[in-house]
C-alpha cells in the first residue's frame, strides 16, 4: 500500500514539476506588442527600436508622419501646413511637393514618382518612405501580419550572437512568457 502511495505522490509531483517548468505554448499578440490599434497603422522600428509613433499604409506603400521623419531620420524636410507643401533644400535648389501629387519640382524642373509623395489625414502629414529614402541614407523593409516597417539609419557595427539551436523568441525572458516567433 505504501508503494502505491509513493507512486501516486511521484506522479502528482512529476505533473506539478512538468507544468511549472515546461515552456508556455501561448503566442503573444503581435499587434499589441508593436502597439498597433487600427487597421491602417504600421509599426515603425528604427535601428532595432520600436517607436510609439506609427506610420500608415496607403496603396501598399508605407508613409511616415512628418514629425517622425523630422525627429528620427532627416530634419531637413520642412512641412508647411498653411500652404500644404513639403520642402526639402539641396545644394542645387529646393524640392517642392504638393499634397496629393506624385510630382515635385526642383529648380523649375518637374519630376514625378509612381506614388503620391505626401498625403494628409486631418492635420497629420504623411510622407512616402520611398521619397524619404531618396534623400536620406536609410534602408527599409516592410513586413506583414502585423504591418510594420523596419528602417536602418545607423551604419555602425551591430552586436550579434550565434544561436546554438532552434528555439522560440519570447516576449520576456523565461519559458512561461508568450512567444513572439518560432
Question: What annotation goes with each model-predicted range?
Answer:
Residues 182:
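Conserved PDZ fold ligand-binding element
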Residues 1-179:
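Primary recognition of N-terminal secretory signal peptides and signal-anchoring hydrophobic helices
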